[in-house]
């Protein structure tokens, strides 16, 4: 299956383009999809995007079997409307995959269906690394905050993954100490719940850190600009 990856950023709260690409590439690799092109957009996607040459080349190429998006929210119009607009210039149906949402839009007639969340293996390794970092006294908030953004895109995206894998995350937390070495812990249910809640609360603190960092970077870029006072 030949596919095109579509990434887009519409606000500071969106996962970075690079993170979206990483997740989509992992998804394609898992399903043995052949990536033939990657499209980067700024802003949400609608029918107007289809008017650009980059999109026309993809849509009119019947050798392209599917588009791989990071999430459904990248599209500002109905997925069905976007599909119909694309099909006006195609003779062969095209599928759409949404990696983070574990959804696919295809079939005859086309409709949404659930898919397996194939980024779990990637996320699990990164979550293990994150837990080790958080247990290291030498790692400050800035290092951990940057790790979260670089590997998960946002704190909200990370929390979504964690909340859908509570049992596994809790077992990793309870089997790791400050040096990342496995230890025996109590099987007490309350201890397990407390450990998970404490971990989640720590992660929530990085929401503020992320926004402050982004605003600082934005202010820095503005200060670098040459502002001409036109009279």
Swiss-Prot record:
Main localization is host cell
Classification via Pfam families: Pox_F16
Superkingdom as given in the UniProt entry? Viruses
Where in or outside the cell? Host nucleus, Host nucleolus
Q: Which InterPro entries match?
A: Poxvirus_F16 (IPR006798)
Q: Which UniProt keywords apply?
A: Early protein, Host nucleus
Output a single Gene Ontology CC term carried by this record: host cell nucleolus
| Induction text | Expressed in the early phase of the viral replicative cycle.
Do the record's keywords include Amino-acid biosynthesis? Answer: no
Q: Which family does it belong to?
A: Belongs to the orthopoxvirus OPG058 family.
Name this polypeptide is given: Protein OPG061
Species name for this entry?
Answer: Variola virus (isolate Human/India/Ind3/1967) (VARV)
Give the lineage.
Viruses, Varidnaviria, Bamfordvirae, Nucleocytoviricota, Pokkesviricetes
């Amino acid at each position: 299956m030949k596919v095109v990856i579509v990434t887009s950023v519409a606000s500071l709260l969106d996962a970075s383009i690079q993170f979206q690409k990483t997740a989509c590439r992992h998804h394609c690799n898992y399903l043995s999809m052949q990536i033939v092109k990657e499209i980067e957009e700024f802003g949400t996607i609608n029918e107007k995007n289809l008017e650009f040459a980059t999109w026309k080349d993809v849509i009119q190429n019947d050798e392209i079997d599917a588009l791989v998006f990071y999430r459904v929210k990248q599209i500002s119009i109905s997925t069905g409307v976007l599909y119909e607009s694309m099909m006006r210039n195609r003779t062969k149906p095209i599928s759409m995959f949404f990696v983070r949402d574990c959804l696919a839009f295809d079939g005859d007639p086309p409709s949404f269906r659930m898919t397996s969340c194939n980024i779990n293996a990637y996320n699990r390794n990164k979550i293990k690394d994150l837990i080790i970092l958080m247990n290291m006294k030498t790692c400050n908030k800035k290092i951990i905050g940057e790790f979260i953004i670089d590997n998960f895109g946002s704190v909200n995206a990370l929390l979504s993954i964690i909340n859908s894998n509570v049992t596994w995350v809790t077992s990793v937390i309870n089997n790791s100490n400050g040096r990342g070495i496995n230890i025996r812990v109590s099987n007490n249910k309350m201890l397990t719940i407390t450990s998970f809640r404490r971990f989640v609360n720590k992660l929530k603190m990085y929401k503020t850190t992320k926004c402050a960092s982004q605003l600082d970077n934005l202010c820095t870029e503005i200060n670098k600009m040459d502002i001409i006072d036109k009279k």
